[in-house]
């Protein structure tokens, strides 16, 4: 009964240890350079064929022979599966691991699971991949991962580094989210990504979460999620700007969604613009974030706004800005609406001195509540202006046209001369 509950831990079989006290020979140096173990066992011969002779097809049966002989079974099975994957024999590698992993030690089971996950992904067996990922996450939840330890030593690109249980959990949750998205199960994929991000922030997972939200039609949430993406860390485990590929995917999806919504908007330009703004409200957030340190932007000084709600980047902050007075401009002369007739044909009428008097009297009549003194003064000015008279020729007509249309031609000089004459006449009357 007890034998069924507790299984004794198996240790990894190995080749006979070489005797101590023997100096390193030239052959041993060769094996150290090529990372080939020393000896003449079946596993050593298989590794020599794989790494030195560069013949992976002939190395596969030699690994089989080493496993059957019980020589370094853990390493032989892992190496054989990797070589099979490189030779596009992933299905055979999966069956080999499933049938032979019972011969391996407990310490090798986790590494075999990781190789299986890669093989499942290569073969497109998403259901098997999702099931294995959930099983590994269950082991982490129960505290059975890493053989009960908090960290393990991993190897990537020839370098060793320590991996904690939390880091392994975020990696597995990210892979689970990706596999679920391939199955169009976006609800569970969103949950997996959010659980991973609750453990530790990650740019790549944040971008994939945004894509997952877009797949569900939650555009606003996706945009808000992508706004929180920070620049990549230089010495991160994935290298510089590891999330740029996910950013490109997000941008492509937004373009597709934008085209679809623009198509649904019909020919109405206003509706298309509204849909476009709803999707691409801030185009800057879809640009790849540079790999730089987090810096706090200085608050712009008052008055540096260029009118669009954003500060002017070209203004030197150390120099006091010159406040532009909007009233300090070369304004054109002011003309009352009583003087200007909207119909251009009516502007061509020939004006006499009596008409000029009527126009001037019309100006004075617009102001209500004038005192008797100001009224008498105005009538006196109108009388003397009538005596001076307005020019009864085409100059005055051209001046009025130029004032209405605002054209800057030679007529301006005539207009100025005409109005100078009027002003001079009025000044003399005062």
Curated annotation (Swiss-Prot):
Pfam families, alphabetized: TPR_19
Q: Where is this region: Disordered?
A: 1-21, 346-376
The Gene Ontology biological process terms listed for this entry are:
cell division
Could you list the residue ranges forming a coiled coil in this record?
Answer: 81-107
Where are the annotated TPR repeats, by residue?
A: 40-73, 74-107, 110-143, 170-203, 205-236, 238-257
**What keywords is this UniProt entry annotated with?**
Cell cycle, Cell division, Coiled coil, Nucleus, Repeat, TPR repeat
Q: Where in the cell is it found?
A: Nucleus
Q: List the disulfide bonds.
A: none
Which InterPro entries does the record match to this protein? MS5/SDI1 (IPR044961), TPR-like_helical_dom_sf (IPR011990), TPR_rpt (IPR019734)
Q: Which GO terms describe its cellular component?
A: nucleus
The similarity annotation says: Belongs to the MS5 protein family.
* PANTHER family the UniProt entry points to: PROTEIN POLLENLESS 3-LIKE 2
Q: What does this protein do?
A: Probably involved in the regulation of cell division.
Name the record gives this protein:
Protein POLLENLESS 3-LIKE 2
The beginning of the lineage is: Eukaryota, Viridiplantae, Streptophyta, Embryophyta, Tracheophyta
């Amino acid at each position: 009964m007890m034998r069924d509950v507790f299984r004794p831990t198996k240790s990894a079989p190995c080749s006979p240890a070489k005797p101590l006290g023997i100096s390193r020979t030239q052959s041993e140096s060769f094996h150290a350079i090529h990372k080939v173990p020393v000896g003449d066992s079946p596993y050593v011969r298989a590794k020599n064929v794989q790494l030195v002779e560069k013949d992976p097809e002939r190395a596969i049966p030699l690994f089989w022979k080493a496993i059957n002989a019980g020589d370094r079974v853990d390493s032989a099975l892992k190496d054989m599966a990797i070589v099979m994957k490189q030779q596009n024999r992933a299905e055979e590698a999966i069956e080999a691991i499933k049938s032979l992993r019972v011969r391996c030690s407990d310490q090798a089971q986790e590494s075999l699971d990781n190789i299986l996950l890669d093989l499942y992904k290569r073969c497109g067996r998403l259901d098997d991949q999702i099931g294995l990922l959930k099983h590994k996450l269950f082991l982490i939840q129960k505290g059975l991962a890493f053989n009960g330890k908090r960290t393990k030593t991993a190897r990537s690109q020839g370098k060793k580094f320590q991996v904690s249980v939390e880091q392994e959990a975020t990696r597995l949750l990210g892979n689970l989210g990706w596999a679920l998205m391939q199955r169009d199960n976006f609800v569970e994929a969103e949950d997996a990504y959010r659980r991973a991000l609750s453990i530790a922030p990650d740019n790549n997972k944040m971008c994939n979460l945004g894509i997952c939200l877009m797949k569900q039609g939650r555009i606003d949430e996706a945009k808000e999620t992508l706004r929180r993406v920070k620049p990549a860390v230089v010495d991160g485990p994935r290298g510089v700007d590891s999330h740029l590929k996910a950013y490109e995917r997000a941008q492509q999806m937004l373009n597709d969604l934008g085209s679809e919504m623009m198509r649904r908007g019909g020919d109405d330009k206003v509706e298309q613009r509204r849909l476009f703004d709803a999707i691409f409200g801030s185009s800057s957030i879809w640009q790849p974030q540079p790999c730089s340190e987090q810096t706090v932007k200085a608050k712009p000084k008052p008055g540096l706004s260029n009118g669009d709600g954003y500060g002017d980047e070209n203004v030197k902050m150390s120099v006091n800005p010159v406040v532009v007075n909007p009233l300090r401009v070369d304004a054109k002369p002011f003309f009352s609406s009583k003087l200007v007739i909207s119909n251009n044909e009516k502007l061509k009428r020939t004006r006499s001195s009596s008409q000029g008097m009527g126009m001037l009297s019309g100006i004075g009549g617009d102001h209500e509540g004038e005192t008797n003194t100001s009224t008498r003064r105005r009538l006196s000015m109108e009388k003397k202006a009538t005596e001076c008279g307005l020019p009864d020729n085409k100059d005055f007509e051209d001046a009025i046209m130029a004032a209405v249309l605002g054209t800057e031609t030679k007529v301006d000089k005539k207009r100025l001369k005409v109005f100078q004459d009027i002003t001079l006449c009025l000044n003399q009357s005062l």
